[in-house]
Amino acid sequence: MQDVKVWDLFVRLFHASTALVFLLNYFVTEDGSALHSYLGYGLLALLGLRVIWGFIGGYHARFKNFMPTVAGVKEHISAMFFGEKDDHLGHNPLGALMVFNLLGSLALLCTTGILAETDMFWGMKWMEDVHEFLANYVLISVALHLLGVAFETKRSKINLVKAMITGKKNMPLN
């Protein structure tokens, strides 16, 4: 096994900050409070920076380098099902799908939160309902993400949590 640098500091700080802001807004702040709004705007700013970093960041941070394909997803699922070795230095295909799922759903969550505060949508229950649905959808996605990380860590014997903290994956020598 060999430590290989994968996740740059920006990606790791983005990941931790996004998780913290979402969890604070979901579990701690009061809906509609100033703090809830400020954290939502902060989350949107983080997402904007991550999109920029997805084009100019390091190799494994760039979207073009982990675009999932149907064939890649099928191969990865097959390897999981049949217990075959299928190590990925960056995101595996299912992990890549989850990245895009979370980035998109968090962006929609922020957008509906902002819209709910505008004159056009103020007090409209359906907008609040969409915002709440998206918050719950993100929470379920986060739970699935954590289950996927735990499963893949056990399956591959590569500690993905440690990799996100240190930026280095302990990869098998080929």
Spans of model-derived segments:
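Membrane-embedded alpha-helical bundles that constitute the cytochrome b-like, heme-associated redox core
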Residues: M1-N174
